[in-house]
Protein backbone atom coordinates (compact mmCIF):
# COMPACT_ATOMS: atom_id res chain seq x y z
CA UNK A 1 0.00 0.00 0.00
CA UNK A 2 1.51 3.34 -1.07
CA UNK A 3 -1.06 5.67 0.44
CA UNK A 4 -4.73 5.84 1.11
CA UNK A 5 -6.86 8.88 1.75
CA UNK A 6 -9.25 6.94 3.94
CA UNK A 7 -12.19 7.57 1.61
CA UNK A 8 -13.32 4.13 0.49
CA UNK A 9 -16.37 5.60 -1.26
CA UNK A 10 -14.21 7.15 -4.01
CA UNK A 11 -13.76 3.80 -5.79
CA UNK A 12 -10.11 3.33 -4.87
CA UNK A 13 -9.71 1.46 -1.62
CA UNK A 14 -5.97 0.75 -1.74
CA UNK A 15 -3.61 3.24 -3.38
CA UNK A 16 -4.84 6.81 -3.73
CA UNK A 17 -3.15 10.03 -2.77
CA UNK A 18 -3.97 12.15 0.22
CA UNK A 19 -4.31 15.70 -1.07
CA UNK A 20 -3.93 18.83 1.01
CA UNK A 21 -4.99 22.07 -0.60
CA UNK A 22 -2.89 25.14 0.14
CA UNK A 23 -4.78 28.33 -0.54
CA UNK A 24 -2.78 31.26 -1.91
CA UNK A 25 -2.57 34.11 0.57
CA UNK A 26 -1.29 37.35 -0.99
CA UNK A 27 -0.52 39.83 1.81
CA UNK A 28 1.86 42.78 2.23
CA UNK A 29 2.71 45.08 5.13
CA UNK A 30 4.02 48.60 4.49
CA UNK A 31 5.96 50.41 7.20
CA UNK A 32 7.41 53.90 6.92
CA UNK A 33 9.83 55.56 9.30
CA UNK A 34 11.33 59.02 9.16
CA UNK A 35 14.40 60.74 10.53
CA UNK A 36 15.57 64.33 10.24
CA UNK A 37 19.04 65.44 9.21
CA UNK A 38 19.42 68.83 10.87
CA UNK A 39 21.05 71.67 8.94
CA UNK A 40 23.21 72.47 11.96
CA UNK A 41 21.00 74.90 13.87
CA UNK A 42 19.54 72.30 16.26
CA UNK A 43 15.93 73.08 15.30
CA UNK A 44 13.75 70.99 13.01
CA UNK A 45 12.69 73.40 10.31
CA UNK A 46 13.52 75.01 7.00
CA UNK A 47 16.50 73.46 5.24
CA UNK A 48 16.48 70.22 7.20
CA UNK A 49 16.14 66.96 5.29
CA UNK A 50 13.48 64.41 6.20
CA UNK A 51 14.73 60.94 5.26
CA UNK A 52 12.03 58.32 4.74
CA UNK A 53 12.59 54.56 4.79
CA UNK A 54 9.69 52.51 3.43
CA UNK A 55 9.70 48.74 3.87
CA UNK A 56 7.29 46.38 2.13
CA UNK A 57 7.12 42.86 3.56
CA UNK A 58 5.49 39.97 1.72
CA UNK A 59 3.60 38.33 4.59
CA UNK A 60 1.79 35.94 2.26
CA UNK A 61 2.69 32.58 0.79
CA UNK A 62 2.98 33.52 -2.91
CA UNK A 63 5.50 35.51 -4.92
CA UNK A 64 4.25 39.00 -5.76
CA UNK A 65 5.07 40.90 -8.94
CA UNK A 66 4.55 44.38 -10.39
CA UNK A 67 5.15 45.95 -6.97
CA UNK A 68 4.75 49.72 -7.08
CA UNK A 69 5.08 52.30 -4.31
CA UNK A 70 3.32 55.66 -4.39
CA UNK A 71 3.90 58.44 -1.92
CA UNK A 72 1.70 61.30 -0.77
CA UNK A 73 3.40 64.18 1.02
CA UNK A 74 1.37 67.08 2.46
CA UNK A 75 1.82 69.93 4.90
CA UNK A 76 -0.45 70.47 7.92
CA UNK A 77 -2.90 72.41 5.74
CA UNK A 78 -3.29 69.47 3.34
CA UNK A 79 -1.29 71.16 0.57
CA UNK A 80 0.61 68.64 -1.58
CA UNK A 81 4.38 68.84 -1.41
CA UNK A 82 6.92 67.51 -3.90
CA UNK A 83 9.33 64.85 -2.67
CA UNK A 84 12.99 65.76 -3.21
CA UNK A 85 13.76 62.25 -4.42
CA UNK A 86 11.97 58.93 -4.37
CA UNK A 87 10.61 56.70 -3.43
CA UNK A 88 13.33 54.67 -5.08
CA UNK A 89 14.15 50.97 -4.69
CA UNK A 90 17.09 50.37 -2.38
CA UNK A 91 17.13 46.55 -2.29
CA UNK A 92 15.47 43.40 -0.97
CA UNK A 93 16.73 41.06 1.76
CA UNK A 94 16.39 37.91 -0.39
CA UNK A 95 17.86 39.45 -3.52
CA UNK A 96 14.77 40.08 -5.65
CA UNK A 97 14.91 42.94 -8.09
CA UNK A 98 12.63 45.92 -8.44
CA UNK A 99 8.97 44.93 -8.52
CA UNK A 100 9.21 41.36 -7.16
CA UNK A 101 8.74 40.05 -3.60
CA UNK A 102 9.20 36.44 -2.58
CA UNK A 103 7.21 35.09 0.41
CA UNK A 104 8.81 36.50 3.57
CA UNK A 105 10.96 38.98 1.64
CA UNK A 106 11.31 42.63 2.63
CA UNK A 107 11.98 45.33 0.02
CA UNK A 108 13.31 48.73 1.05
CA UNK A 109 12.56 52.03 -0.64
CA UNK A 110 13.94 55.44 0.30
CA UNK A 111 12.83 59.02 -0.23
CA UNK A 112 13.67 62.45 1.12
CA UNK A 113 12.16 65.91 1.44
CA UNK A 114 13.98 69.17 2.14
CA UNK A 115 11.76 71.27 4.42
CA UNK A 116 10.75 74.55 2.79
CA UNK A 117 9.75 77.75 4.60
CA UNK A 118 6.14 77.30 3.46
CA UNK A 119 5.98 73.73 4.78
CA UNK A 120 7.67 74.66 8.06
CA UNK A 121 5.16 77.44 8.70
CA UNK A 122 2.31 74.92 8.76
CA UNK A 123 3.94 73.07 11.67
CA UNK A 124 3.77 69.51 10.33
CA UNK A 125 4.52 67.33 7.35
CA UNK A 126 2.53 64.17 6.73
CA UNK A 127 3.66 61.37 4.49
CA UNK A 128 1.75 58.24 3.48
CA UNK A 129 3.06 55.48 1.23
CA UNK A 130 0.91 52.89 -0.53
CA UNK A 131 2.25 49.69 -2.06
CA UNK A 132 0.35 47.67 -4.66
CA UNK A 133 1.35 44.31 -6.15
CA UNK A 134 -0.04 41.43 -8.18
CA UNK A 135 -0.33 37.82 -7.03
CA UNK A 136 -0.13 34.92 -9.51
CA UNK A 137 -2.95 35.15 -12.05
CA UNK A 138 -4.20 38.48 -10.66
CA UNK A 139 -3.50 42.15 -11.31
CA UNK A 140 -2.95 44.76 -8.59
CA UNK A 141 -4.95 42.73 -6.07
CA UNK A 142 -2.68 43.26 -3.05
CA UNK A 143 -2.15 46.63 -1.37
CA UNK A 144 -1.40 48.26 1.96
CA UNK A 145 -0.98 51.78 3.30
CA UNK A 146 1.98 52.65 5.49
CA UNK A 147 2.08 52.90 9.22
CA UNK A 148 4.99 54.06 11.33
CA UNK A 149 5.96 50.60 12.57
CA UNK A 150 4.12 50.99 15.88
CA UNK A 151 0.42 50.24 15.53
CA UNK A 152 -0.12 50.82 19.27
CA UNK A 153 0.59 54.56 19.15
CA UNK A 154 -2.58 55.54 17.29
CA UNK A 155 -0.49 56.66 14.31
CA UNK A 156 -1.26 53.83 11.96
CA UNK A 157 -1.23 55.57 8.60
CA UNK A 158 1.43 58.27 8.47
CA UNK A 159 4.52 59.89 9.92
CA UNK A 160 4.10 63.38 11.28
CA UNK A 161 7.08 65.60 11.90
CA UNK A 162 6.46 68.85 13.71
CA UNK A 163 8.58 71.66 12.41
CA UNK A 164 9.57 75.12 13.52
CA UNK A 165 9.41 78.15 11.24
CA UNK A 166 12.72 79.38 9.91
CA UNK A 167 14.27 82.26 11.84
CA UNK A 168 14.89 83.75 8.39
CA UNK A 169 11.13 84.01 7.80
CA UNK A 170 10.26 87.72 8.21
CA UNK A 171 6.50 87.03 8.35
CA UNK A 172 6.67 85.98 12.03
Model segments located where?
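Terminal edge beta-strands and adjacent linker/stalk segments
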Residues: 1-23, 141-161
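Extracellular beta-sheet repeat scaffolds used for adhesion and glycan interaction
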Residues: 8-9, 13, 39-40, 73-115, ...
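Short, solvent-exposed loop/edge segments of extracellular or virion-exposed proteins
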Residues: 31-40
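Short beta-strand elements of extracellular/lumenal beta-sandwich folds
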Residues: 47-62
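Short, hydrophobic/aromatic beta-strand segments
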Residues: 62-70
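Short glycine/proline/serine/threonine-rich loop/turn segments at secondary-structure transition edges
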Residues: 117-126
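Conserved small/polar residues in nucleotide/adenosyl-binding loops
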Residues: 162-169
